[in-house]
């Protein structure tokens, strides 16, 4: 019997800290922030898979959402607090357990109170999904009663 090879996070990626709400359900999730770009990734595990043994579409949607929003936040100069108001995704190929998935926001623009982000999710064979998102940059504190906005997904692990 042969063992299935499990890919690992490439060099330069750090584990996303716990305590970020729903994103914690994807753990372990990794990120690499360089300048004004952020890349997120994960190794597809059983917790990410559907009954066919491939990565669940909801996992891909969540990975697209955090990548698109973080890309827009970086372009706008804020760390978090910007809700996604639109997200569309095209599923192109499957990703199997043990494969490294990497999500990248490739085109980001900011217009007034909105950020627009599009990109892709890839495995070693190529594109798994393409996404497009619109993010709203509120001019108020929203639901946060104590006045904080937080630093969300951009918070460095060594600071937390």
PLM segments and residue spans:
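Terminal targeting signals and extreme-terminal segments of soluble enzymes
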Residues: 1-160
């Amino acid at each position: 019997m042969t063992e299935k090879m499990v890919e690992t996070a490439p060099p330069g990626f750090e584990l996303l800290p716990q305590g970020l709400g729903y994103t914690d359900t994807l753990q372990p999730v990794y990120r690499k922030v360089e300048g004004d770009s952020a890349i997120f990734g994960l190794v597809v595990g059983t917790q990410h898979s559907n009954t066919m043994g491939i990565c669940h579409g909801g996992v891909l949607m969540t990975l697209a959402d955090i990548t698109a929003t973080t890309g827009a936040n970086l372009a706008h100069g804020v760390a978090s607090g910007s809700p996604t108001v639109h997200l569309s995704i095209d599923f192109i190929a499957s990703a199997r357990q043990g494969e490294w998935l990497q999500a990248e926001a490739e085109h980001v623009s900011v217009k007034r109170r909105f950020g627009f982000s599009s990109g892709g999710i890839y495995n070693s064979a190529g594109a798994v999904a393409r996404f497009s998102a619109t993010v709203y940059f509120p001019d108020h504190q929203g639901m946060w009663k104590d006045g904080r906005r937080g630093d969300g997904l951009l918070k460095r692990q060594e600071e937390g």
